[in-house]
Protein backbone atom coordinates (compact mmCIF):
# COMPACT_ATOMS: atom_id res chain seq x y z
CA UNK A 1 0.00 0.00 0.00
CA UNK A 2 1.14 3.55 -0.74
CA UNK A 3 0.44 6.73 1.19
CA UNK A 4 1.70 10.15 2.26
CA UNK A 5 3.18 10.92 5.67
CA UNK A 6 1.00 13.57 7.32
CA UNK A 7 2.57 13.59 10.78
CA UNK A 8 5.78 12.39 12.38
CA UNK A 9 6.24 12.04 16.13
CA UNK A 10 9.64 10.38 15.96
CA UNK A 11 8.55 6.80 16.43
CA UNK A 12 5.07 6.80 14.88
CA UNK A 13 4.00 8.21 11.52
CA UNK A 14 0.48 9.11 10.46
CA UNK A 15 0.09 8.00 6.85
CA UNK A 16 -2.81 8.92 4.57
CA UNK A 17 -3.54 6.12 2.13
CA UNK A 18 -4.45 6.65 -1.51
CA UNK A 19 -8.04 5.86 -0.49
CA UNK A 20 -8.02 8.66 2.09
CA UNK A 21 -7.73 6.53 5.23
CA UNK A 22 -5.27 7.43 8.00
CA UNK A 23 -3.04 4.69 9.40
CA UNK A 24 -0.56 4.91 12.27
CA UNK A 25 2.69 3.34 11.09
CA UNK A 26 6.11 2.50 12.43
CA UNK A 27 9.36 2.22 10.53
CA UNK A 28 10.79 -1.14 9.59
CA UNK A 29 14.46 -1.31 10.58
CA UNK A 30 16.80 1.55 9.74
CA UNK A 31 16.53 3.70 6.65
CA UNK A 32 19.32 5.59 4.97
CA UNK A 33 18.24 7.74 2.05
CA UNK A 34 21.07 8.23 -0.43
CA UNK A 35 23.60 8.58 2.36
CA UNK A 36 21.71 11.36 4.14
CA UNK A 37 22.58 11.25 7.83
CA UNK A 38 19.49 12.77 9.39
CA UNK A 39 17.84 12.54 12.79
CA UNK A 40 14.57 11.63 11.06
CA UNK A 41 14.81 9.31 8.05
CA UNK A 42 11.08 9.72 7.41
CA UNK A 43 9.62 13.22 7.12
CA UNK A 44 6.20 14.79 6.67
CA UNK A 45 5.45 14.86 2.95
CA UNK A 46 7.23 11.60 2.17
CA UNK A 47 5.51 9.12 -0.12
CA UNK A 48 5.89 5.68 1.45
CA UNK A 49 4.95 2.06 0.91
CA UNK A 50 3.62 0.25 3.97
CA UNK A 51 1.98 -2.98 5.02
CA UNK A 52 -0.86 -3.35 7.51
CA UNK A 53 0.06 -5.25 10.66
CA UNK A 54 -1.95 -8.45 10.88
CA UNK A 55 -1.08 -9.12 14.50
CA UNK A 56 -2.31 -5.81 15.89
CA UNK A 57 -5.83 -5.30 17.26
CA UNK A 58 -5.76 -1.67 16.11
CA UNK A 59 -5.24 -0.65 12.48
CA UNK A 60 -1.49 -0.01 12.31
CA UNK A 61 1.14 -0.47 9.66
CA UNK A 62 4.85 -0.81 8.98
CA UNK A 63 6.68 1.44 6.52
CA UNK A 64 9.20 -0.46 4.43
CA UNK A 65 9.96 1.86 1.48
CA UNK A 66 10.36 5.62 0.99
CA UNK A 67 9.79 6.87 -2.55
CA UNK A 68 12.34 9.21 -4.12
CA UNK A 69 11.75 12.78 -2.97
CA UNK A 70 11.32 15.55 -5.50
CA UNK A 71 12.81 17.89 -2.88
CA UNK A 72 13.19 18.45 0.83
CA UNK A 73 14.31 21.22 3.16
CA UNK A 74 16.67 20.75 6.10
CA UNK A 75 18.39 22.50 8.97
CA UNK A 76 21.03 21.44 11.44
CA UNK A 77 19.78 19.22 14.20
CA UNK A 78 19.42 21.07 17.49
CA UNK A 79 21.06 18.40 19.64
CA UNK A 80 23.35 16.72 17.12
CA UNK A 81 25.07 19.53 15.26
CA UNK A 82 26.77 17.22 12.76
CA UNK A 83 23.46 15.77 11.64
CA UNK A 84 20.61 17.32 9.73
CA UNK A 85 16.93 17.44 10.48
CA UNK A 86 14.60 17.09 7.49
CA UNK A 87 11.79 19.56 8.11
CA UNK A 88 9.53 18.39 5.26
CA UNK A 89 9.66 16.89 1.78
CA UNK A 90 7.87 17.05 -1.57
CA UNK A 91 6.77 20.65 -1.08
CA UNK A 92 5.90 23.24 -3.71
CA UNK A 93 6.66 26.38 -1.72
CA UNK A 94 7.66 27.56 1.74
CA UNK A 95 6.23 30.54 3.57
CA UNK A 96 8.38 32.15 6.25
CA UNK A 97 6.33 34.17 8.72
CA UNK A 98 8.12 37.31 9.85
CA UNK A 99 7.13 39.63 12.69
CA UNK A 100 8.92 42.90 13.42
CA UNK A 101 8.11 42.80 17.12
CA UNK A 102 6.31 40.48 19.48
CA UNK A 103 8.44 38.43 18.74
CA UNK A 104 11.15 40.04 16.58
CA UNK A 105 12.46 38.13 13.57
CA UNK A 106 16.08 38.96 12.77
CA UNK A 107 17.49 39.46 9.31
CA UNK A 108 20.08 36.75 9.94
CA UNK A 109 17.31 34.23 10.61
CA UNK A 110 15.43 35.30 7.46
CA UNK A 111 18.54 35.08 5.31
CA UNK A 112 19.59 31.67 6.63
CA UNK A 113 16.15 30.32 5.85
CA UNK A 114 16.17 31.84 2.34
CA UNK A 115 19.67 30.51 1.60
CA UNK A 116 18.56 27.00 2.56
CA UNK A 117 15.46 27.25 0.37
CA UNK A 118 17.62 28.45 -2.54
CA UNK A 119 20.08 25.61 -1.99
CA UNK A 120 17.32 23.00 -2.13
CA UNK A 121 15.49 24.60 -5.06
CA UNK A 122 12.28 25.50 -3.23
CA UNK A 123 10.45 28.78 -3.76
CA UNK A 124 10.38 30.84 -0.56
CA UNK A 125 7.83 33.58 0.14
CA UNK A 126 7.91 36.03 3.06
CA UNK A 127 4.76 36.73 5.04
CA UNK A 128 4.93 39.86 7.20
CA UNK A 129 2.35 38.99 9.84
CA UNK A 130 0.68 41.04 12.60
CA UNK A 131 0.68 44.25 10.54
CA UNK A 132 -2.24 45.46 12.68
CA UNK A 133 0.10 45.73 15.69
CA UNK A 134 2.71 47.98 14.06
CA UNK A 135 3.41 51.49 15.33
CA UNK A 136 5.13 54.24 13.34
CA UNK A 137 8.66 52.91 13.97
CA UNK A 138 7.91 49.22 13.49
CA UNK A 139 5.88 49.99 10.36
CA UNK A 140 8.92 51.80 8.98
CA UNK A 141 11.08 48.75 9.80
CA UNK A 142 8.59 46.39 8.17
CA UNK A 143 8.31 48.39 4.96
CA UNK A 144 12.10 48.74 4.79
CA UNK A 145 12.58 44.99 5.14
CA UNK A 146 9.90 44.32 2.55
CA UNK A 147 11.67 46.69 0.15
CA UNK A 148 14.97 44.83 0.59
CA UNK A 149 13.51 41.43 -0.24
CA UNK A 150 11.17 42.61 -2.98
CA UNK A 151 14.11 44.26 -4.76
CA UNK A 152 15.99 40.95 -4.64
CA UNK A 153 13.02 39.20 -6.23
CA UNK A 154 11.25 37.51 -3.33
CA UNK A 155 7.47 37.61 -3.11
CA UNK A 156 6.26 39.33 0.05
CA UNK A 157 2.81 39.48 1.63
CA UNK A 158 1.52 41.76 4.40
CA UNK A 159 -1.03 39.98 6.57
CA UNK A 160 -3.09 40.41 9.69
CA UNK A 161 -4.53 37.05 10.68
CA UNK A 162 -6.71 38.55 13.41
CA UNK A 163 -8.23 41.16 11.08
CA UNK A 164 -8.28 38.83 8.05
CA UNK A 165 -6.18 41.22 5.95
CA UNK A 166 -4.29 39.59 3.08
CA UNK A 167 -5.55 36.10 3.94
CA UNK A 168 -7.55 35.67 0.71
CA UNK A 169 -4.49 36.59 -1.37
CA UNK A 170 -2.46 33.97 0.50
CA UNK A 171 -5.12 31.32 -0.11
CA UNK A 172 -5.00 32.07 -3.86
CA UNK A 173 -1.25 31.40 -3.84
CA UNK A 174 -1.75 28.05 -2.11
CA UNK A 175 -4.42 26.50 -4.34
CA UNK A 176 -3.31 23.17 -5.78
CA UNK A 177 -0.01 23.19 -3.90
CA UNK A 178 1.71 21.76 -0.83
CA UNK A 179 2.92 24.71 1.24
CA UNK A 180 5.14 24.63 4.31
CA UNK A 181 4.82 27.32 6.99
CA UNK A 182 7.79 28.15 9.20
CA UNK A 183 8.99 30.85 11.59
CA UNK A 184 9.77 31.60 15.21
CA UNK A 185 7.42 30.47 17.96
CA UNK A 186 4.75 33.13 18.40
CA UNK A 187 4.81 34.63 14.89
CA UNK A 188 1.24 33.46 14.34
CA UNK A 189 1.49 30.33 12.19
CA UNK A 190 -1.36 28.51 13.91
CA UNK A 191 -3.50 31.66 14.09
CA UNK A 192 -3.03 32.19 10.36
CA UNK A 193 -3.94 28.58 9.55
CA UNK A 194 -7.06 28.95 11.69
CA UNK A 195 -7.97 32.12 9.79
CA UNK A 196 -7.77 30.19 6.52
CA UNK A 197 -9.46 27.04 7.86
CA UNK A 198 -11.38 27.76 11.11
CA UNK A 199 -12.54 24.14 11.41
CA UNK A 200 -8.98 23.00 12.25
CA UNK A 201 -8.99 24.77 15.65
CA UNK A 202 -5.20 24.70 15.97
CA UNK A 203 -3.87 25.67 19.38
CA UNK A 204 -2.44 29.20 19.56
CA UNK A 205 -0.05 30.83 22.03
CA UNK A 206 0.39 34.06 23.95
CA UNK A 207 3.66 36.02 23.70
CA UNK A 208 5.64 36.44 26.92
CA UNK A 209 5.83 40.15 27.79
CA UNK A 210 9.21 39.63 29.45
CA UNK A 211 11.03 37.69 26.75
CA UNK A 212 8.96 38.77 23.72
CA UNK A 213 9.12 35.12 22.67
CA UNK A 214 6.30 32.73 21.86
CA UNK A 215 5.68 29.36 23.42
CA UNK A 216 5.67 26.17 21.32
CA UNK A 217 2.12 25.18 20.34
CA UNK A 218 3.07 22.88 17.45
CA UNK A 219 5.21 20.01 18.75
CA UNK A 220 5.60 18.03 15.54
CA UNK A 221 5.37 18.93 11.86
CA UNK A 222 1.95 18.03 10.50
CA UNK A 223 0.21 18.25 7.14
CA UNK A 224 -3.42 19.32 6.78
CA UNK A 225 -5.85 19.14 3.88
CA UNK A 226 -7.59 22.48 3.39
CA UNK A 227 -11.05 22.99 1.94
CA UNK A 228 -9.83 25.20 -0.93
CA UNK A 229 -7.77 22.49 -2.66
CA UNK A 230 -4.53 23.10 -0.81
CA UNK A 231 -2.32 21.27 1.65
CA UNK A 232 -0.28 22.91 4.36
CA UNK A 233 2.58 21.63 6.50
CA UNK A 234 2.59 23.39 9.87
CA UNK A 235 5.99 23.16 11.56
CA UNK A 236 7.13 23.75 15.15
CA UNK A 237 8.45 27.22 15.92
CA UNK A 238 12.23 27.45 15.73
CA UNK A 239 14.60 29.87 17.49
CA UNK A 240 17.56 29.59 15.13
CA UNK A 241 18.15 28.15 11.70
CA UNK A 242 21.41 26.22 11.49
CA UNK A 243 22.84 26.07 7.98
CA UNK A 244 23.88 22.64 6.76
CA UNK A 245 27.52 22.60 5.62
CA UNK A 246 28.14 24.38 2.31
CA UNK A 247 31.35 24.98 0.41
CA UNK A 248 32.52 28.60 0.91
CA UNK A 249 32.52 29.29 -2.83
CA UNK A 250 28.92 28.04 -3.13
CA UNK A 251 27.31 30.28 -0.53
CA UNK A 252 27.14 33.49 -2.56
CA UNK A 253 25.29 31.59 -5.28
CA UNK A 254 22.34 31.25 -2.91
CA UNK A 255 22.08 35.04 -2.53
CA UNK A 256 20.31 35.98 -5.81
CA UNK A 257 21.63 39.55 -5.84
CA UNK A 258 25.19 38.23 -5.38
CA UNK A 259 24.75 35.54 -8.01
CA UNK A 260 23.89 38.15 -10.65
CA UNK A 261 27.19 39.94 -10.07
CA UNK A 262 29.69 37.24 -9.12
CA UNK A 263 30.86 36.66 -12.72
CA UNK A 264 32.00 40.30 -12.75
CA UNK A 265 34.49 39.68 -9.94
CA UNK A 266 38.14 39.54 -11.01
CA UNK A 267 38.69 36.13 -9.43
CA UNK A 268 36.48 33.10 -10.09
CA UNK A 269 36.89 31.93 -6.49
CA UNK A 270 36.23 35.36 -4.99
CA UNK A 271 34.68 35.14 -1.52
CA UNK A 272 33.72 38.84 -1.59
CA UNK A 273 35.72 39.77 1.49
CA UNK A 274 39.13 41.38 0.91
CA UNK A 275 39.73 40.45 -2.73
CA UNK A 276 40.45 43.30 -5.18
CA UNK A 277 37.97 44.20 -7.92
CA UNK A 278 35.05 42.44 -6.22
CA UNK A 279 31.73 43.26 -7.88
CA UNK A 280 29.73 42.45 -4.74
CA UNK A 281 31.80 44.80 -2.56
CA UNK A 282 31.50 47.51 -5.22
CA UNK A 283 27.71 47.12 -5.29
CA UNK A 284 27.66 47.17 -1.50
CA UNK A 285 29.48 50.51 -1.38
CA UNK A 286 26.90 51.92 -3.81
CA UNK A 287 24.07 50.66 -1.57
CA UNK A 288 22.91 48.38 -4.37
CA UNK A 289 23.16 45.44 -1.96
CA UNK A 290 21.74 45.63 1.56
CA UNK A 291 24.31 45.62 4.36
CA UNK A 292 22.16 43.24 6.41
CA UNK A 293 22.33 40.72 3.56
CA UNK A 294 26.09 41.07 3.27
CA UNK A 295 26.52 40.67 7.03
CA UNK A 296 24.36 37.53 6.93
CA UNK A 297 26.55 36.21 4.12
CA UNK A 298 29.70 36.81 6.17
CA UNK A 299 28.25 35.04 9.22
CA UNK A 300 27.34 32.00 7.13
CA UNK A 301 30.72 32.06 5.37
CA UNK A 302 32.59 32.23 8.67
CA UNK A 303 30.47 29.49 10.23
CA UNK A 304 29.19 31.87 12.89
CA UNK A 305 26.71 29.44 14.40
CA UNK A 306 26.89 30.95 17.88
CA UNK A 307 25.48 34.32 16.97
CA UNK A 308 23.10 33.66 14.12
CA UNK A 309 20.16 35.06 16.10
CA UNK A 310 21.76 38.51 16.41
CA UNK A 311 21.22 41.68 14.38
CA UNK A 312 18.28 43.95 13.75
CA UNK A 313 16.78 45.96 10.95
CA UNK A 314 18.47 49.34 11.11
CA UNK A 315 21.97 48.14 10.30
CA UNK A 316 21.67 49.02 6.60
CA UNK A 317 20.69 52.61 7.26
CA UNK A 318 23.23 53.10 10.02
CA UNK A 319 26.09 50.80 9.07
CA UNK A 320 29.15 51.66 11.11
CA UNK A 321 32.39 52.92 9.59
CA UNK A 322 34.06 49.76 10.86
CA UNK A 323 31.62 47.58 8.92
CA UNK A 324 32.25 49.56 5.73
CA UNK A 325 36.03 49.12 5.85
Swiss-Prot record:
<keyword id="KW-0378">Hydrolase</keyword>
<feature type="binding site">
    <location>
        <begin position="129"/>
        <end position="132"/>
    </location>
    <ligand>
        <name>GTP</name>
    </ligand>
</feature>
<dbReference type="GO" id="GO:0005737">
    <property type="term" value="C:cytoplasm"/>
</dbReference>
<keyword id="KW-0963">Cytoplasm</keyword>
<dbReference type="InterPro" id="IPR012340">
    <property type="entry name" value="NA-bd_OB-fold"/>
</dbReference>
<keyword id="KW-0342">GTP-binding</keyword>
<dbReference type="InterPro" id="IPR031944">
    <property type="entry name" value="RsgA_N"/>
</dbReference>
<dbReference type="InterPro" id="IPR030378">
    <property type="entry name" value="G_CP_dom"/>
</dbReference>
<dbReference type="InterPro" id="IPR010914">
    <property type="entry name" value="RsgA_GTPase_dom"/>
</dbReference>
<comment type="similarity">
    <text>Belongs to the TRAFAC class YlqF/YawG GTPase family. RsgA subfamily.</text>
</comment>
<feature type="domain" description="CP-type G">
    <location>
        <begin position="80"/>
        <end position="241"/>
    </location>
</feature>
<dbReference type="GO" id="GO:0042274">
    <property type="term" value="P:ribosomal small subunit biogenesis"/>
</dbReference>
<feature type="binding site">
    <location>
        <position position="270"/>
    </location>
    <ligand>
        <name>Zn(2+)</name>
    </ligand>
</feature>
<protein>
    <recommendedName>
        <fullName>Small ribosomal subunit biogenesis GTPase RsgA</fullName>
        <ecNumber>3.6.1.-</ecNumber>
    </recommendedName>
</protein>
<dbReference type="GO" id="GO:0005525">
    <property type="term" value="F:GTP binding"/>
</dbReference>
<dbReference type="GO" id="GO:0046872">
    <property type="term" value="F:metal ion binding"/>
</dbReference>
<dbReference type="Pfam" id="PF16745">
    <property type="entry name" value="RsgA_N"/>
</dbReference>
<dbReference type="InterPro" id="IPR004881">
    <property type="entry name" value="Ribosome_biogen_GTPase_RsgA"/>
</dbReference>
<feature type="binding site">
    <location>
        <position position="272"/>
    </location>
    <ligand>
        <name>Zn(2+)</name>
    </ligand>
</feature>
<feature type="binding site">
    <location>
        <position position="278"/>
    </location>
    <ligand>
        <name>Zn(2+)</name>
    </ligand>
</feature>
<dbReference type="InterPro" id="IPR027417">
    <property type="entry name" value="P-loop_NTPase"/>
</dbReference>
<feature type="binding site">
    <location>
        <begin position="183"/>
        <end position="191"/>
    </location>
    <ligand>
        <name>GTP</name>
    </ligand>
</feature>
<dbReference type="GO" id="GO:0003924">
    <property type="term" value="F:GTPase activity"/>
</dbReference>
<comment type="subunit">
    <text>Monomer. Associates with 30S ribosomal subunit, binds 16S rRNA.</text>
</comment>
<feature type="binding site">
    <location>
        <position position="265"/>
    </location>
    <ligand>
        <name>Zn(2+)</name>
    </ligand>
</feature>
<dbReference type="Pfam" id="PF03193">
    <property type="entry name" value="RsgA_GTPase"/>
</dbReference>
<dbReference type="GO" id="GO:0019843">
    <property type="term" value="F:rRNA binding"/>
</dbReference>
<keyword id="KW-0690">Ribosome biogenesis</keyword>
<keyword id="KW-0862">Zinc</keyword>
<keyword id="KW-0547">Nucleotide-binding</keyword>
<keyword id="KW-0479">Metal-binding</keyword>
<keyword id="KW-0699">rRNA-binding</keyword>
<keyword id="KW-0694">RNA-binding</keyword>
<comment type="function">
    <text>One of several proteins that assist in the late maturation steps of the functional core of the 30S ribosomal subunit. Helps release RbfA from mature subunits. May play a role in the assembly of ribosomal proteins into the subunit. Circularly permuted GTPase that catalyzes slow GTP hydrolysis, GTPase activity is stimulated by the 30S ribosomal subunit.</text>
</comment>
Amino acid sequence: MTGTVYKSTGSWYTVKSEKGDFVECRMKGKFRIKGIKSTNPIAVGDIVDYELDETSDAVTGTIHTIHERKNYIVRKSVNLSKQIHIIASNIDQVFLLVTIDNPPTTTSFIDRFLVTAEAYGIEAILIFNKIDTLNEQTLDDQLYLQHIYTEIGYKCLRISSTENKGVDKLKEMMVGKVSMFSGHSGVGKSTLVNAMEPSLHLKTSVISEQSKQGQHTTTFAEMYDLSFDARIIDTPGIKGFGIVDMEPTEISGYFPEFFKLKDQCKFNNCLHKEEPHCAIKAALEKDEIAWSRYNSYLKILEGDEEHYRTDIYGEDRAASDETRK
